[in-house]
């Protein structure tokens, strides 16, 4: 159509004058104002002329047109369109030149037409921050909330007995009714809390910290056996594990706001948790569902569009394997340290017996004092074995379970993606069925087919949004998990090294004190 403009070149066609310009610019533009007939029949040439003129204008001049154009849009269209119809086209020329998507047929470089306002240009050119940058900009989650678990108490006799723990909470958060309160909870209550949180949040991609594992042997000893050192050791291990578990729960901003968490911490009596036993009627279907999920996960082959998720999943799987190997070695270390403590105690007793039967007074005194030193060293070995377990072995055990939950979050994202893909496949089948109905000329079933297509189109859109949402949540949760893991490992390793240093210092102190006695033997 541009070639039918009466042989007029594009450089000679200028847009109509803008109201409010300087006198000299009005005079320059008025000399080449196009006729009304040209504007009505060949409106596309107006855009071409506007594009060429904009190339000859300076950026400063182009920017100054914007506020005037806004005034023209308000006044020229609504108040003066009867008197000056050319202003309508002039306004349309500037408006359409801003939108490059409407003039794709002309292939005009939109950036050369007119410059954006400073604020809009800044916003459009500013790169979007990554998730890592957003996490670093945010302040660390600091909740004035401390939960302690103390006083494990056996209630009842025989196999019906159970252990209740005192859960004490100290906080200044307005979410809770008071600053300090305490309740009694049994182990099944902790498991029930995890079941509730997992049911609500895991399907959305959140990493719900897992509770400590069950121990049928340890609990049976506590229920049936007498109170001995092994039962006390088991209860202390479980108490510490439950305390770490509940502290991780309240440190998570999403979990902290959950009403089930507040109810667990505040309410005096909770309804009995059902289905938490492995061999219960409600526990068997859960085992079956887990096996079914494992099989279905093996059959899903996801075409990963984001390399970040693929790399992170590989990192998580490799880290879990390495932690399992390290945990096995640390458990061996703990057992060897306990054996060393027992052997040191036996050695101390033998030295004491030898010293009591020795005739040489100086030698007898030296042997007796050496036996005392060995008893102190046996105590150091026992304390260090406990430190090996609580500071190192339990840390590794916790993160092995946590990494399994992280993998479950990736699996949940994969299941959401698969649901989206299945919906797309179903939608395609519905459309093919509609095409067959059209081909067979069956109008009675056509409306139902169209309704089903609309329904599945809505589902596909919703499932796509669900996938995008869970991808965002999983990414943020993994980044948060890695930060928490780094802090956790740093704190525990520092404490562990401090215990090793203290143990070595005490050993040196004991031997330095004993050395004069050994030299005094005559």
UniProtKB/Swiss-Prot annotation:
| Protein residues bound to a 1,2-diacyl-sn-glycero-3-phospho-(1D-myo-inositol-3-phosphate) | 186, 188, 214, 238
Main localization (coarse): membrane
**Domain PX span(s) in chain numbering:** 143-272
Its GO CC terms are: cytosol; early endosome membrane; endosome membrane; Golgi apparatus; lamellipodium
Region spans: Membrane-binding amphipathic helix: 281-298
Instruction: Please tell me whether the keyword Magnesium is annotated for this protein.
Output: no
One of the record's GO molecular function terms: phosphatidylinositol binding
Signal peptide coordinates: none
Q: Which residues carry this modification: Phosphoserine?
A: 32, 39, 58, 72, 188, 280
Against CDD domains, the record matches this protein to: BAR_SNX1, PX_SNX1
Its membrane topology: Peripheral membrane protein
Q: Indicate where the modification N6-acetyllysine is found in the sequence.
A: 237
Give residue ranges for domain BAR: 302-522
* Chain intervals with Acidic residues compositional bias: 35-45, 132-142
Q: Other remarks on record?
A: Binds phosphatidylinositol 3-phosphate (PtdIns-(3)P) and phosphatidylinositol 3,5-bisphosphate (PtdIns-(3,5)P2) in liposome-based assays. Can bind PtdIns(3,4,5)P3 in protein:lipid overlay assays, but not in liposome-based assays.
Family (UniProt): Belongs to the sorting nexin family.
Q: What is the recorded function of this protein according to its Swiss-Prot or TrEMBL entry?
A: Involved in several stages of intracellular trafficking. Interacts with membranes containing phosphatidylinositol 3-phosphate (PtdIns(3P)) or phosphatidylinositol 3,5-bisphosphate (PtdIns(3,5)P2). Acts in part as component of the retromer membrane-deforming SNX-BAR subcomplex. The SNX-BAR retromer mediates retrograde transport of cargo proteins from endosomes to the trans-Golgi network (TGN) and is involved in endosome-to-plasma membrane transport for cargo protein recycling.
**Listed name of the protein:** Sorting nexin-1
Organism equals Pongo abelii (Sumatran orangutan)
Q: From the UniProt record, report the name of the gene that encodes this protein.
A: SNX1
